[in-house]
């Protein structure tokens, strides 16, 4: 049994004594970027921390999980034209997160979940998890709180599709996690231009499945997209509970995954000692 759930609280003797091959490491990755006029730039960090705080209390003592320090700054160049946004280049953050994965692998841990709270990090994580598989035959998982879903019928289909930034979902979560930072007097329905694009064009979309490179101002000049005025703390609390429970299910999946499923190809087999 591990003495803690947090990587940073372990001593080197704790790591030496632990069977790290049985541990699942979790790397929370976030962003510091503008979130419209009604929310702080730390939204993605606060949401990741809030979900994790909700989940940690539900992790059984005998579940070998270690949560690494939150990586607060990510790839946010799509928001760089708004004051307060901090961003790494895609090259810098890819290298940094890959090297964190290298360090995790060097402890003997070969299961790592990237727990993301910012859409702009997606291409980075896709590249990093593949690289860690190549380097370490590691189960490197690309996960996100958003991908774990929300309670049924809580948000409209339009909001789920287009309320992607500082809309109903994120504002509700912030009302649950950090209400002291939310300015509901400045919240509104920040209508995304993606809705008009979807109606006007046959295949072209702003994001997916066939999208283009966009800046936040392309969606809405105020830097938000979605109906923030409809947000409530009750919805945020329900989302937090849903996400925490789903995260535990994900941990169980990753713990149960047999690394023997990750097969070496013929060149790797040829390099292996006989």
What are the residue ranges of the model-derived segments?
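Extended, histidine- and acidic-residue-enriched regions that form the cofactor-binding/catalytic faces
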Residues: 1-111, 119-274
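Conserved SAM-binding loop
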Residues: 114
């Amino acid at each position: 049994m591990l003495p803690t759930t947090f990587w940073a609280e372990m001593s080197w003797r704790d790591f030496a004594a632990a069977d790290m091959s049985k541990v699942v490491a979790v790397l929370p990755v976030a962003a510091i970027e503008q979130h419209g006029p009604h929310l702080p730039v730390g939204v993605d960090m606060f949401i990741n921390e809030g979900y994790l705080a909700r989940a940690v209390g539900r992790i059984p003592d005998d579940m070998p999980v270690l949560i690494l320090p939150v990586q607060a700054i990510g790839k946010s160049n799509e928001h760089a034209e708004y004051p307060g946004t901090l961003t790494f280049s895609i090259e810098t953050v890819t290298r940094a997160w890959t090297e964190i994965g290298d360090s995790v692998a060097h402890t003997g841990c070969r299961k790592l979940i990237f727990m993301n709270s910012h859409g702009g990090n997606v291409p980075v994580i896709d590249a990093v998890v593949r690289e860690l598989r190549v380097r370490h035959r590691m189960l490197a998982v690309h996960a996100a709180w958003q991908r774990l879903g929300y309670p049924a019928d809580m948000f409209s289909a339009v909001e789920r599709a287009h309320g992607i930034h500082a809309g109903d979902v994120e504002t509700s979560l912030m009302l649950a996690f950090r209400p002291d930072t939310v300015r509901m007097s400045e919240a509104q329905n920040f209508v995304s231009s993606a809705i008009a694009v979807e109606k006007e064009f046959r295949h072209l979309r702003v994001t997916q499945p066939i999208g283009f490179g966009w800046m936040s101002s392309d969606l809405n000049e105020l830097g938000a997209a979605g109906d923030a005025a409809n947000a409530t703390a009750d919805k945020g609390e329900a989302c937090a509970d849903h996400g925490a429970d789903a995260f535990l299910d994900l941990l169980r999946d990753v713990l149960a995954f047999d690394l023997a499923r990750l097969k070496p190809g013929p060149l790797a087999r040829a390099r292996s000692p006989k």
